[in-house]
Amino acid sequence: MSIRTGDSVQGFSLPARPGEMVDLAECIGTEKVVLLFFPLSFSPVCTDEFCAIRDDWSAYADLGAKVFGISIDSPFVTAKFAEELGLPFPLLSDMNRDVCRMFDVLHEDLFGMRDVAKRSVFVIDEGGSV
């Protein structure tokens, strides 16, 4: 079952880099949270997308929301991608695809690759609802 508008979201943990877990239960239900699902680190479209977000960061900061990018890449890759782009928010690794499945954002086939995250955005309010 996938998450839809109005549904409550439970917290979950994902690695931001090897050995560093981010527990979204600490902010879901108490703060606004923006989840940016993206297919692949270092791909041209994802690079352009995250550079645009970085360059217009004040629009996100003005929302008072915590922002997290999520992909199926390893935490080594997401950490390097975030570092190279100078992102002001963490990119999280969902290698096991549990969170992508929960939000129903997996491509069955993307250029011959199975179970890659769909480019999707979810905004979760302070009460924990999408």
Language-model regions, residue ranges each:
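Chalcogenol-based redox active-site neighborhoods
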Residues: M1-V130
